[in-house]
Amino acid sequence: MEVRIDSSVKEKVESVRLGCLVYDVKVKEKNEELWGKLENEIFPQLVSVIEEKGINGVENISSSKKAYKSLGKDPNRYRVSSEALYRRIKQGKGLYQINTVVDTNNLISLETGFSAGSYDLKNVKGNIVLRKGAEGETYKGIGKDDINIENLPVLADSEGAFGSPTSDSTKAMVTLNSEKILTLIYCFSKDENLEKILNKSKEYLEKYAGAKNIETFTVE
C-alpha cells in the first residue's frame, strides 16, 4: 500500500504532510485507563489552554483552517475534526466513547491539535492519495447524512474518497471486527516535529488500543 499527496493539494498547501501508523489490533469497546487520562488530565489541561488563547489560538488548528481556506473550503462551516473536539471540551460535553482505536485516535488529535483519522484497511482498495475533493463530490458520513467534500482535502482509494480531516465516510470506519488499521495524522504545519508526534502516537496506540507490529512513516 502506497500513500501519497496529490498535486491538487500540494500546489495550494505547501506545508502539507501526513503522519501514518499501520498496525494490527484487536479492537475493544473501552480502555478505562485511557478514559481516566482523558477525564482527569487532558480535558482539564485543554480547558486551561482554551481559556488562555482560545481555540483559534491553538497553532495546529489554526494552520489546518488556513489550509482549508487555501483549498477553497470555508473552515467555519466545515470544521476540522480537532476543532470540533476542542469545542466539545470547551462546552463541557466531553467526548463520545466509541472504541479503543477511535478513542486513542481522539487523544492524539486533542494532544496535537491536528485532525487524525483511523481506517480499516480491509475496506481500502489499492493505494491511498490525499487529493482535493472534486466538484459536487459527496460521501456518507459516519453518523451523518451525505457530506459535501468538494474542495476538502480527502483521502481516496481506487474506488473513491473515504476520509477527510472534517469527517470520515462509513466505508473504512473502525469497528470491533477491524484487525488491520491505518491511523493518519493530517499535518498542515511545516514547523511541527511530525516524527515526535508519530512516536508518541505509537506509544498511545500500544498502551491504550493494544496495537502490535506498528509501522510508522511520513508522507510529503
Residue ranges and their predicted role:
Residues 1-220:
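Charge-biased, low-complexity intrinsically disordered regions
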